[in-house]
Amino acid sequence: MQTSHLFTALQQRQQQRDNRYLKGLVVILLLSLLISLCAGDIWLWPTQWFSETGRLFVWQLRLPRALAVLMVGASLAVSGAVMQALFENPLAEPGLLGVANGAGVALVMAVLLGHGLLPIWFLSACAIAGALLMTMLLLGFARRRLLTNARLLLVGVALGIVCSAIMTWAVYFSTSLDLRQLMYWMMGGFSGIDWRHQGLVLALLPIVLWLCCQGHVLNFMSLGEQQAQQLGVSLHLWRNLLVLAIGLLVGVSVALAGVISFIGLVIPHILRLTGLTDQRRLLAGCALAGGGILLLADIVARIALFSAELPIGVVTATLGAPLFIWLLTRVKSVK
């Protein structure tokens, strides 16, 4: 009985601590959103939001962009956490394993073949198809045990490099102005986002919410195939559903903002280091932290240069690459 009471007390303490972390992430997200609406070449404080200038810059330009950044950040972070559980690899994430680049290749080829005349929904469908194809290919390697986790990571990186090379060659040899402008898109950016793109942004919301509610399934899957099946989890069904959800999130995110790396890798690890290890709370934390961190990166991209804007993919890569190196050394030391 004493052991049972002790376990219950420890569990309640862990839940209280996790809830405090999640509340803190909500505060960070709201502050990031507030700063994002204020920041720019012209800083507009909340008291100026309803002026004539504020109605243009805040409500017509900055708000739709901030909502898109928030949802893309949440989508990439949640996708990274789910991929790490699916592949049983702590270094898995959409950008590193080539999933985002697969979506990018499909989108670039659609623009090339369509001469820049295809509607945004068709380009999004192509990006989703590319992301799904790459994810299923990698998952097939992982589940057939054809490759170790380390080799699977290298295969994903190699596929990502090949996809990047294809996109670069396509842009270089193109005479289409639309395709040449995709060079900026390939580095990631939200500069062209407005209210016309909010349909894609809203499409991300139900998928992110659904994934955040599947933490118990990922907890069961982490126990191993045999134990998960004994608990009534259909592994084949859930793997396909999760792969489909990841492909949708990554495909729409790439269609909106281009290829943005390291958000899906770094955010889950940072949250695990703070103690959020239960997938039921980790996924919600990833959604909040991913949105907040990408909002902060977008603010840096907008204000770092006067009258110019850095590609947000460059900002996340600059900040995320040192953390990725540290994670690699940490995984090696643990082994």
From Swiss-Prot:
GO terms for biological process: cobalamin transport. One of its GO terms (cellular component) is plasma membrane. The chain crosses the membrane at residues 25-45, 67-87, 95-114, 118-140, 153-173, 200-220, 243-263, 286-306, 308-328. It is found in: Cell inner membrane. The keyword Repeat does not apply. InterPro entries: ABC_BtuC-like, ABC_transptr_BtuC, ABC_transptr_permease_BtuC. It is a multi-pass membrane protein. GO terms for molecular function: vitamin transmembrane transporter activity. Keywords: Cell inner membrane, Cell membrane, Membrane, Transmembrane, Transmembrane helix, Transport. CDD domains: TM_ABC_iron-siderophores_like (cd06550). The complex is composed of two ATP-binding proteins (BtuD), two transmembrane proteins (BtuC) and a solute-binding protein (BtuF). Belongs to the binding-protein-dependent transport system permease family. FecCD subfamily. HAMAP family: BtuC. PANTHER family: FERRIC ENTEROBACTIN TRANSPORT SYSTEM PERMEASE PROTEIN, VITAMIN B12 IMPORT SYSTEM PERMEASE PROTEIN BTUC. Part of the ABC transporter complex BtuCDF involved in vitamin B12 import. Involved in the translocation of the substrate across the membrane. This is Vitamin B12 import system permease protein BtuC. It comes from Yersinia enterocolitica serotype O:8 / biotype 1B (strain NCTC 13174 / 8081).
